[in-house]
């Protein structure tokens, strides 16, 4: 009888999904985010010692709350693995504290895990706001995964690895995309750019770039974002977003080159 109960519990976990949300002072959008994921089996909020009402909101919604010490971290990635490990169920959906999950996406994920050939990871398209406009073209995030064998590196903009194949949801089905609510002003984008590129330098220790790279890599990133990733269809906002994306690459490479030059300073 005990063995039967253990097997039943194991099967139940295989058919359930835990939502994991990493937070730090995330009160602005958190209620809407939690409303959008209320149809899942478990919601885990992994908080990095917020000083606003984030924890109050999470507890009010009945979330499982765990704490990851913030220390000097300025990015979320160091807390990702801990958050995933805190989930009860075998399948985990990682949601940022400014992203909405549609009913259609939830249904798609439950349908997926009911099939024997379900991929170990699913890349989900994400539609982003910028300058008050919701972009139709998405970026992809590997956010739905099987917990067993998953590893999320602690470096900025890292992607998890999973134990098995992955697949992408079709971008043309807009109803399956995350809705990214963050509509950062250009000033805030530039402020974040400085923080994020500092972390990019740490991630790329030992990487070497040439002056050619400094020119061509940011240029290609801008052109790709504008012409091949749909920016051209979004007017001035599309051009501004593409240039900011290229600037991110330029500042990253410039800081890495600066770091190398300073190592050679013999003063």
What are these language model-derived features?
Residues 16-18:
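Cell-envelope/extracellular polymer assembly enzymes that use nucleotide-activated donors
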Residues 20-39:
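Short, well-formed alpha-helical segments that are part of the catalytic scaffolds
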Residues 21-24, 49, 70-74, 116:
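Catalytic phosphate/metal-binding cores of nucleic-acid and nucleotide-processing enzymes, i.e., regions
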Residues 28-31, 52-61, 104-105:
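Acidic helix N-cap motif at the loop->helix transition within catalytic regions
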Residues 36, 47-56, 96:
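A conserved acidic beta->alpha catalytic loop
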Residues 55-86:
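Conserved donor nucleotide-binding strand/loop of the catalytic core
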Residues 77-78, 84, 95, 102-263:
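Catalytic-site signature of metal-activated, phosphate-bearing donor transferases
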Residues 92:
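Short aromatic/hydrophobic "clamp" motif used to bind/position activated sugar donors
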């Amino acid at each position: 009888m005990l063995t039967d109960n253990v097997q039943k519990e194991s099967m139940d976990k295989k058919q359930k999904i835990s939502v994991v949300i990493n937070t730090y002072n995330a009160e602005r959008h958190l209620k809407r985010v939690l409303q959008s994921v209320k149809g899942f089996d478990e919601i885990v909020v992994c908080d990095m010692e917020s000083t606003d009402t984030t924890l109050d909101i999470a507890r009010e919604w009945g979330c499982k709350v765990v704490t990851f010490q913030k220390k000097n971290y300025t990015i979320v990635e160091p807390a990702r693995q801990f958050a995933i490990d805190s989930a009860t169920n075998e399948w985990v959906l990682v949601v940022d504290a400014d992203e909405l999950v549609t009913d259609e996406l939830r249904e798609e994920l439950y349908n997926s895990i009911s099939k024997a050939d379900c991929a170990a990871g699913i890349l989900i398209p994400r539609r982003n706001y910028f300058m008050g406009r919701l972009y139709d073209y998405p970026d992809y995030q590997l956010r739905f995964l099987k917990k067993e064998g998953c590893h999320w590196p602690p470096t900025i903009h890292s992607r998890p690895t999973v134990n098995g194949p992955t697949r992408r949801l079709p971008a043309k089905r807009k109803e399956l995309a995350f809705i990214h609510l963050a509509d950062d002003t250009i000033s805030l984008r530039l402020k974040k750019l400085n923080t994020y590129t500092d972390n990019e330098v740490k991630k790329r220790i030992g990487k070497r770039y040439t002056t050619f790279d400094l020119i061509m890599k940011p240029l290609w990133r801008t052109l790709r974002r504008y012409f091949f990733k749909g920016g051209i269809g979004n007017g001035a906002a599309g051009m501004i977003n593409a240039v900011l994306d290229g600037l991110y690459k330029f500042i990253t490479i410039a800081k890495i080159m600066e770091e190398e030059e300073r190592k050679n300073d013999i003063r």
